[in-house]
Amino acid sequence: MKRRRVHFAALLILAATTAGLLSQLVLGGSDRVRIGNGSVSALTRSSTAVDSLPDSVLAYPFAARNFASKNGEGSRLLRLTGTLRLYAVPGKEGMLCLIEVDDAAGTAGGACADRHVLLTGSIYMADRQEDGSRLVVGLVGDGHTYAEAEDRRVPVQSNAFVLRGVDGSSVTVGSPTAVQTIDLGD
C-alpha cells in the first residue's frame, strides 16, 4: 500500500513537471517580451460623436457575439487615415475588439482577443490587397511607440498602427526599450 502511494506521488510530480514544461514550450515563457501593462489609454478619454460605431457594423452578428454592449458602448475611434477608420471596442468577458471600416471599399472587419494579448503582442488584422501585399492594422497597449515591417517604421498613435504594402510574414511592434514580433501567418 505504501509503495502505491509513493508511485502515485512520483507520477503526480512527473505529470505536474511535464505540464509546466509543455505550457512554457507551447504558450511561451520568459522569451515573451512585455511592453507596458496592457492598458489602452485611448479607451479612457471622453467620448465624442465620432467615436460611435456605424450602424452597419452594429448590425453584424460579429458585434452581437463579441461586443460588451449591443450598441458598442465605450467604442473609441483610434485612427482615421483617408477612408480607413480604426475603432477599439470593449468586448465580452474581458475581451477587446479592433474594428476596421473602409468607407471607400464599403467594407468592415474585426478581431477580438483577451486584453492580456496586449502585454506581449497586438490585436491585429492583415488584409490581402489586390497587389498581393497586406494592409496590417493593429491595436496595441500603452507603451508601444512604433510598428515596423520591411525597414518601414510607422508611429503608434492612439494605441493603433497602420502599415500598408506589407509583403513579409511578420510585423514588429516596439518601444524604446523592447521589441515584439507578430507572426502574420501565410
Identify the meaning behind each predicted range:
Residues 25-104, 181, 186:
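Extracytoplasmic low-complexity, Pro/Thr/Ser/Ala/Gly-rich segments
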Residues 145-186:
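Ser/Thr-rich low-complexity repeats and stalk/linker segments
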Residues 107-112, 158-160:
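A short, polar/proline- and glycine-enriched secondary-structure boundary/capping micro-motif
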Residues 7-25:
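Hydrophobic membrane-insertion alpha-helices, especially the h-region
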